[in-house]
Regions:
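Catalytic-core segments of class I nucleotidyltransferases/pyrophosphorylases
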Residues: 40, 56, 91-179
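A short acidic, often aromatic-flanked loop/helix-cap motif at beta-alpha or helix-coil junctions
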Residues: 10-15, 75, 101, 157-158
Length: 180
C-alpha cells in the first residue's frame, strides 16, 4: 500500500525537517513496522506517468541496491538536485549536486527504490555520522560502494519548481495524451 509520511518534525511542531535523513529517521519506527521488503519514496513536486512494475522489474534485473528515476532534460531549480553520469549499463558512476538549471542533464526526479533493510542501515549510519543530506551523504558518497542504477522516466514527467512550472504542469495535464 501507499503511505504518506508527515512533512513536520512532530505533531505540534510547525518547522520542517532539516533534511531527508532527519525526516526518514523520524519515521523509522513506521518504516520498521512495515511488512514490505521494498521502499519506494518520491517527492510531492513530481508529476510522472510511470509503470511501477516496470521499475521494480528493472531494479531486480539489474540486481541494484538503489534505483533512481531520472529524466533527461533541463535541470529544475531545486536545492540538492542530483545530476548523473552513467556507464553503458545505466549504472550511476558520478553524481553532481545542484547543477546549473540551464543545462541539459540526466537529473533525479527523487523517486528512489531500495530494500527496506538497506534504507534502515543507510539512514542509521548517516545519523550516527551527523549527516543530513540524503543526496550528498548517502547517494553521492556511496556511488562506488553500492549498485546504484538510473531508470529513465520516458513518459510524461514534470518537476514543479516554481509557480510558473506549476501552472504549466496543470495546463499540460489537460491534454488527455499526457494522462495515459
Amino acid at each position: 500500500g501507499m503511505f504518506i509520511l508527515p512533512p513536520f518534525a512532530s505533531a505540534g511542531n510547525k518547522s520542517f525537517y532539516s533534511g531527508r535523513v532527519e525526516a526518514l529517521k523520524a519515521n523509522m519506527g513506521f518504516i520498521a513496522r512495515s511488512t514490505e521488503e521494498y521502499i519506494l519514496f518520491a517527492d510531492c513536486n513530481n508529476i510522472v506517468n510511470i509503470d511501477i512494475d516496470e521499475l521494480m522489474d528493472y531494479h531486480t534485473d539489474k540486481a541494484a541496491d538503489i534505483t533512481i528515476v531520472y529524466k533527461h532534460g533541463k535541470c529544475p531549480r531545486l536545492q540538492n538536485n542530483m545530476a548523473f553520469s552513467f556507464d553503458d549499463d545505466s549504472r550511476v558512476r558520478m553524481v553532481a549536486m545542484s547543477p546549473a538549471s540551464d543545462t541539459i542533464v540526466d537529473y533525479s526526479m527523487n523517486i528512489i527504490l531500495m530494500k527496506k533493510s538497506l534504507l534502515q542501515r543507510l539512514v542509521n549510519d548517516a545519523v550516527s555520522m551527523n549527516h543530513e543530506s540524503f543526496e550528498r551523504d548517502i547517494i553521492q558518497s556511496n556511488v562506488e560502494k553500492l549498485r546504484i542504477y538510473g531508470f529513465e522516466a520516458k513518459g510524461f514527467s514534470l518537476t514543479v519548481d516554481s509557480m510558473q512550472s506549476y501552472f504549466d504542469a496543470n495546463m499540460q495535464l489537460l491534454d488527455p495524451d499526457n494522462c495515459k
